[in-house]
UniProtKB/Swiss-Prot annotation:
Keywords linked to the UniProt accession: Lyase
InterPro entries in alphabetical order: Pro_racemase_fam
Residues given in the record as substrate binding sites: G102, H103, D262, G267, T268
Catalytic reaction annotation: trans-3-hydroxy-L-proline = 1-pyrroline-2-carboxylate + H2O
Name of the protein in question: Trans-3-hydroxy-L-proline dehydratase
Lineage of origin: Bacteria, Pseudomonadati, Pseudomonadota, Gammaproteobacteria, Alteromonadales
EC identifiers of the protein: 4.2.1.77
Record-level Gene Ontology MF annotations: 4-hydroxyproline epimerase activity; trans-L-3-hydroxyproline dehydratase activity
Family: Belongs to the proline racemase family.
Length: 346
């Protein structure tokens, strides 16, 4: 006996979702193709608010177990809201919604091109994407072997605070910087704390990342120059000079949302890190840096140009990394299933 090919025809009137899954440097992305009702809102931030207020059940259904897991990440494609954009996107995770996602942008560009949703020719193709953090300019091209290569210019990124400190339970005084790269992150020197940024230490990094995040949130209020919806600390990024590849500048381990661990170096995180290094005079313009992740994934970031952003001395970072399609899914919701809305069990 053989099952039919996807999509399966299921008996009964059951809600269904079609997704295309991918990863960027090890970090998953579940791209939601169909299943959501109409999303209302005139701006991408209004759409984000509408989804959070009225459709959040679908986030937990697709991100949490048994269909997902505690570290799943999602992208919900929307209609464009700006004249320049090709499409819009909302980003989902275990706790809620993010303002921007670099690994998600890279995976979306790769998927759009490899499925011929966006056609590529001999010349690089510029793709504009509406995200809650702003309009993202991505570029797709084909290498000599015909493989899709993706990069993006991030939103204005800047050093928000340098050389700060906070008391953290179990650690004492911890020094940190804060950078914005589409979201705010607190950067911690793991080497100074004697912390390993290897995968064998992930449980401790999650625990300390959560504690540091909440300590910084309580002591260092953040105010975005334009959007109050972006005025929050998204995560903690541990940085280390202990790398596996000589060409790498450093390693990032990002703990974000509700203890979620980024398998990639974090696209918005490397963008904000470049802004911090630029502000400290440690890098110049057009100086590419390779940054590793906890699973040895790599992203390259550089500061393309400097510009003012409502009083902030900002840079426009360029970020690149490798993405791969991993599968297509047809998720079915049985109305009798007590776990139909999902659950988290670490």
């Amino acid at each position: 006996m053989k099952l039919n090919k996807l999509p399966l025809e299921v008996v009964g009137n059951r809600q269904q979702f079609i997704t295309l899954d991918a990863h960027t440097e090890g970090e998953p992305l579940r791209i939601i193709i169909s299943g959501y009702p109409e999303i209302l809102g005139e701006t991408i931030l209004e759409m984000k608010e509408y989804v959070a207020q009225h459709l959040d059940r679908y986030r937990t259904l697709l991100m949490h177990e048994p269909r997902g897991h505690a570290d799943m990440y999602g992208a919900l494609i929307t209609r464009p809201v700006s004249k320049e954009a090709d499409f819009g996107v909302l980003f989902l995770h275990n706790e809620g919604y993010s303002s921007m996602c670099g690994h998600g942008i890279l995976a979306l560009v790769k998927v759009m091109c490899e499925t011929n949703t966006i056609l590529l020719g001999c010349e690089p193709r510029v793709i504009k994407i509406d995200a809650p953090a702003g309009l993202i300019t991505a570029t797709a091209s084909l290498d000599e072997e015909g493989r899709v290569q993706a990069s993006f210019e991030n939103v204005d990124s800047w050093a928000e605070a340098i050389n700060c400190s906070v008391m953290v339970e179990g650690l004492g005084e911890v020094n940190y910087d804060i950078g914005f790269g589409g979201a705010y992150y607190a950067y911690i020197d793991a080497d100074a704390l004697g912390l390993s940024c290897g995968r064998e230490n992930v449980a401790q990094l999650i625990d300390l990342g959560r504690r540091i995040k909440h300590a910084v949130m309580d002591s260092h209020p953040l105010v975005h120059p334009l959007e109050s919806d972006l005025s929050f600390l998204y995560g903690t990024i541990f940085i280390s000079k202990e790398v596996t590849e000589k060409a790498a500048h450093s390693r990032h381990v990002c703990i974000f949302a509700d203890g979620e661990v980024d398998r990639s170096p974090t696209g918005t995180g490397v963008a904000a890190r470049a802004a911090l290094l630029y502000a400290k005079g440690e890098i110049g313009l057009n100086q590419p840096l390779v940054i590793e992740s906890i699973v040895d994934g790599k992203m390259t970031v550089s500061a393309l140009r400097e510009q003012d952003f409502h009083g902030k001395k900002a840079i426009i970072p360029q970020v690149s990394g490798r993405s791969y399609i991993t599968g297509q899914h047809q998720f079915i919701v049985d109305p009798d299933d007590q776990f139909q809305d999902g659950f988290i069990l670490r």
